[in-house]
């Protein structure tokens, strides 16, 4: 992390997953490791649904919004936890974070876990975005909804990383901070200044807004009987 992480409170709107434990584990494993696996996964609509659900399930892991990015690390940094009974002092990273001490091994380990898991989730959503264009014919009428939601998720994840790992400096002389990753394959993405980084965030959000104009949540459509109700719970998604 940079010299200082600004106190902030993450507002987590709805990572609500309506699956059993067994189903969750299966969907969470939807991470194609080869091009052949990806081609098979995205050969039908069910594969896209599984991949999108897998992104949400990945975000619900303890390293991300299942703990650290909701009531764990970021809450400690925001001084929402106090000393004593309200803080599990056996978890030494939290006690260090209370004093903004990021140099201890426990602190670094937790910071690395958050960083790695978030970029892993970004890579997964980038694969989904890539195949939404390659398999547009498979998605049909769902293209705008699936790709739009994926773009919004990518912007959301990157913005949270910016808030934690970059300085608040939007001047022309700002130093480069963190990368905005657009490709699913492992590659070194260039570090960007905060101002340039925000341009990418806004670009993804604007594209998402345009694609999601057909989303039932905006249209107020009754979709309870369509596709076994898949579109019926859009209010629980990022958009």
Segments predicted by a language model, with ranges:
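Acidic interhelical loop/turn segments
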Residues: 133-142, 210-239
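Membrane-proximal, proline-rich intrinsically disordered regions
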Residues: 24-75
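Extended ligand-binding clefts on enzyme/binding-domain cores
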Residues: 52, 56-64, 195-196, 227-239
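Short, flexible, mixed-charge acidic loops at enzyme active sites
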Residues: 168-181
């Amino acid at each position: 992390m940079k010299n200082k992480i600004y106190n902030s409170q993450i507002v987590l709107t709805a990572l609500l997953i309506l699956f059993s434990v067994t189903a969750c584990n299966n969907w969470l494993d939807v991470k194609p490791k080869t091009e052949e696996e990806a081609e098979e996964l995205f050969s039908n609509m069910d594969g896209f649904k599984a991949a999108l659900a897998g992104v949400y399930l990945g975000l619900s892991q303890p390293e991300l919004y299942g703990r650290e990015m909701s009531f764990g690390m970021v809450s400690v940094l925001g001084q929402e936890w106090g000393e004593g009974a309200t803080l599990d002092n056996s978890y030494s990273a939290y006690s260090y974070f209370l004093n903004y001490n990021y140099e201890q091994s426990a602190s670094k380990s937790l910071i690395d876990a958050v960083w790695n898991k978030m970029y892993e989730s970004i890579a997964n959503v980038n694969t989904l975005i890539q195949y939404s264009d390659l398999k547009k014919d498979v998605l049909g009428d769902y293209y705008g909804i699936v790709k739009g939601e994926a773009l919004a998720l990518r912007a959301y994840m990157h913005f949270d990383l910016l808030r934690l790992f970059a300085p608040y400096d939007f001047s022309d002389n700002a130093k480069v901070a963190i990368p905005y990753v657009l490709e699913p394959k492992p590659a070194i993405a260039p570090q960007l200044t905060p101002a340039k980084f925000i341009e990418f965030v806004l670009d993804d959000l604007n594209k998402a807004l345009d694609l999601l104009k057909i989303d039932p949540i905006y249209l107020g459509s009754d979709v309870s009987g369509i596709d076994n109700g898949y579109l019926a719970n859009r209010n629980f998604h990022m958009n």
